[in-house]
Amino acid sequence: DLQTTIKQAKNKILDLAIHGKLVPQVPNDEPASELLKRINPKAEITCDNGQYGKIPEGWCETILGELFEHNTGKALNSSNQEGIMRDYLTTSNVYWDTFDLSVVKQMLFKENELEKCTVVKGDLLVCEGGDVGRSAIWNQDYDICIQNHLHRLRPKAELSVRFYYHVLKYLKDNNMIGGKGIGLLGLSSKEL
């Protein structure tokens, strides 16, 4: 079937990109460890191909926390009667590479919660439960808040958020999160 063939082709292209085989590797390019230092000077670089033979020459292994600021949103609390009424997203609004904004809920957010819970254009949102890892990039020209079952990933420097969206999609499609692979039923902050 055509849809299966398209999905397999997308997965193969992403697999090649993740492993540095989609385009030729240029030996004169800046090593990934130097790029990581520019993105996050405090990053701990655990290797630069020392023990990981599976990654391309010049690449390094890191964690999302070195590249993105990470937060989850606010838990719904009916006893909370203070703050500013704001629209917020739940996991039911987030689908693969899109948002369903037909039903957007509201709750009160205190001033000191807004920075942690607000999503801005370019943020990657990732579902913690349900369809674990389901993700989309917020591309609206207005800010919105999130509830606690959504992870907000905001890049610390200029990088391709879309690439990381595709990495999550690849991991999900290949049962490496939320499925048979590592069998996560939820995606906690630590696991992400």
Describe each model-derived feature in a short phrase:
Residues 25-26, 97-99, 135-136, 161-162:
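Short helix/loop capping segments that flank catalytic or ligand/cofactor-binding pockets
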Residues 47-50, 65-78, 92-121, 141, ...:
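Sequence-specific dsDNA recognition surfaces
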